[in-house]
From Swiss-Prot:
GO terms for cellular component: chloroplast thylakoid membrane; proton-transporting ATP synthase complex; proton-transporting two-sector ATPase complex, proton-transporting domain. This is ATP synthase subunit c, chloroplastic. InterPro entries: ATP_synth_csu_bac/chlpt (IPR005953), ATP_synth_F0_csu (IPR000454), ATP_synth_F0_csu_DDCD_BS (IPR020537), ATP_synth_F0_csu_sf (IPR038662), ATPase_proteolipid_c-like_dom (IPR002379), F/V-ATP_Csub_sf (IPR035921). It comes from Staurastrum punctulatum (Green alga). One of its GO terms (molecular function) is lipid binding. Keywords: ATP synthesis, CF(0), Chloroplast, Hydrogen ion transport, Ion transport, Lipid-binding, Membrane, Plastid, Thylakoid, Transmembrane, Transmembrane helix, Transport.
């Protein structure tokens, strides 16, 4: 394998995971903060808010997992070789 392609693939894999986790990380923090605020305002709606929060957190985390899949594909099944 060409060392330049190998080095670029490792850098791209690191960037894929890093950049793919920035947006969901910010979104998860904002969603959790808003959920806590909503529960503080309406404690009787805690179950509904928590269920919606967990579902939305799972969808946000899926974006990070997609970045991990791209990184693993670049490292172990490199299409540029």
């Amino acid at each position: 394998m060409n060392p330049v392609i190998s080095a670029a693939s490792v850098i791209a894999a690191g960037l894929a995971v890093g950049l793919a986790s920035i947006g969901p990380g910010i979104g998860q923090g904002t969603a959790a903060g808003q959920a806590v605020e909503g529960i503080a305002r309406q404690p009787e709606a805690e179950g509904k808010i928590r269920g919606t929060l967990l579902l939305s957190l799972a969808f946000m985390e899926a974006l990070t997992i997609y970045g991990l899949v791209v990184a693993l594909a670049l490292l172990f099944a490199n299409p540029f070789v």
